[in-house]
């Protein structure tokens, strides 16, 4: 899903260019069965997602590693290996379709980029696209995951067992909808760039908005 439902022959030919690298320090941040939360600060607002580390550990480890910069990736402009620099910071949501999804995570910002490697799908959990707000991997076909991801604003059942679901939005879904409805070109590219500024990670759920305090009782004249 670099074009979500389509992929050019040229990109398909690139799929085998690099094997998945060995595990690294990013994997230590992801403990199987323990929730990980990612907060995406965008130019349109903040989105927080819960990552499914038990159900899609390989995918979550990859996302975490690229978000922190602990996983090496290839700079598409220079071809150099990058270590210690988060891939996602400063990237854009390059494709948005109202009532469907928003897509980002491409270091080239074109929908054709990747981190210089591919890794396998994870469908063993049986999760399906049964609700909006699911976070999933974009790909160019079976077992071609890289860095691109999308967040749904619909329930696209035709994507079941085609794209690994590895998280869900827990706060900021209104921001997802807002991004999905920005003015866009005929190619579904936002006319004004929507930037993913930073991703921060935590093993604790964000605090829910404080409930409004009850109004003080009116004093009764004596």
Where are each of the predicted segments found?
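Cyclophilin-like peptidyl-prolyl cis-trans isomerases
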Residues: 4-8, 16-222
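Structured alpha-helical
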Residues: 11
